[in-house]
Amino acid sequence: MPNIASASKRLRQNEVRNLYNRKIKSFLNTQKKKVIKAVDSNDKNLASEEFKKYASALDKAARKSVIHANRAAAKKSDMMKKINAMN
């Protein structure tokens, strides 16, 4: 248990931020699974639509500092490579 008031406040803030970050990361994983499912089904139109949603979610997470901006860019790049490799 923290002895200093500011440490107690930081503990409370970290708990709230942890819940928020977990929620956002879970949403990102769900969006990623949707894109991968579309890629596996060889539906390029569906994959493109799902990718737009995924890219938007990644950008928002990066803007809110849930993930680093470079990490978001790398994830978008990897997913685009999978989509472009489709027949």
Swiss-Prot record:
Database matches in Gene3D superfamilies: Ribosomal protein S20
Keyword Zinc: no
GO annotation, biological process: translation
Signal peptide: none
Lyase as UniProt keyword: no
UniProtKB keywords: Ribonucleoprotein, Ribosomal protein, RNA-binding, rRNA-binding
Record InterPro entries: Ribosomal_bS20 (IPR002583), Ribosomal_bS20_sf (IPR036510)
Pfam families, per the entry: Ribosomal_S20p
GO molecular function annotation: small ribosomal subunit rRNA binding; structural constituent of ribosome
Coiled-coil ranges per UniProt: none
SUPFAM superfamilies cross-referenced by the UniProt entry: Ribosomal protein S20 (SSF46992)
A GO-annotated cellular component: small ribosomal subunit
S-S bridge residues: none
Family: Belongs to the bacterial ribosomal protein bS20 family.
Physiological role: Binds directly to 16S ribosomal RNA.
Protein name stated in the entry: Small ribosomal subunit protein bS20
Source organism per UniProt: Brachyspira hyodysenteriae (strain ATCC 49526 / WA1)
Highest classification ranks of the organism: Bacteria, Pseudomonadati, Spirochaetota, Spirochaetia, Brachyspirales
